[in-house]
């Protein structure tokens, strides 16, 4: 199936959450039990990756929410020129890919979709960074391979400057 068969849409009642399994129980449970509540409470928005021929089957998902980072937490080169103590951004709270889809490069596609989404938001809002809290060292390396930087050595919190990202 080609990449053109993939689409990202907001999570809705038509999506089959019960069939999704990424291999990490907390991420599976979030999608099934918490994502809709977070939307209703305006805490996060969940977006799902599906295939056009099977729009109900969730291939992967990510969540976005407003976030800010203390200026002194950013590396010096990333903080340069910012006159405020807090830097506006977006948090990828969760990013997960169904186990049946792993190993096909779709994780990178899903992350790229989230980054592009944030770049579109940046046109209308003041956003400087995209932040993620990796669940493991392996996940942190995945984000690093995709342009994210750690806040500090050994940290599982990473960021991507939205300054030069364009949709």
What are these regions (language model features)?
Residues 46-52:
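Cytosolic beta-strand hydrophobic patch enriched in CBS
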Residues 103-117, 145:
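Conserved acetyl-CoA-binding loop-helix of GNAT-fold acetyltransferases
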């Amino acid at each position: 199936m080609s990449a053109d068969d993939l689409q990202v849409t907001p999570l809705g009642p038509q999506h089959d959450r019960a069939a999704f399994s990424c291999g990490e129980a907390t991420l599976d449970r979030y999608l099934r039990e918490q994502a809709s509540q977070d939307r209703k409470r305006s805490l996060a928005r969940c977006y799902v990756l599906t295939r056009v021929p099977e729009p109900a089957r969730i291939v992967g998902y990510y969540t976005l929410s407003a976030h800010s980072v203390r200026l002194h937490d950013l590396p010096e080169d990333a903080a340069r020129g910012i006159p405020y103590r807090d830097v506006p951004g977006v948090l990828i709270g969760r990013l997960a890919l169904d186990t049946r889809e792993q190993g096909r490069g779709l994780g990178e596609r899903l992350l790229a979709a989230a980054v592009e989404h944030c770049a579109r938001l940046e046109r209308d809002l003041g956003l400087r960074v995209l932040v993620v809290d990796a669940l493991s060292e392996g996940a942190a390396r995945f984000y690093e391979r995709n342009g994210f930087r750690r806040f500090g050595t050994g940290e599982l919190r990473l960021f991507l400057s939205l300054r030069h990202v364009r949709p």
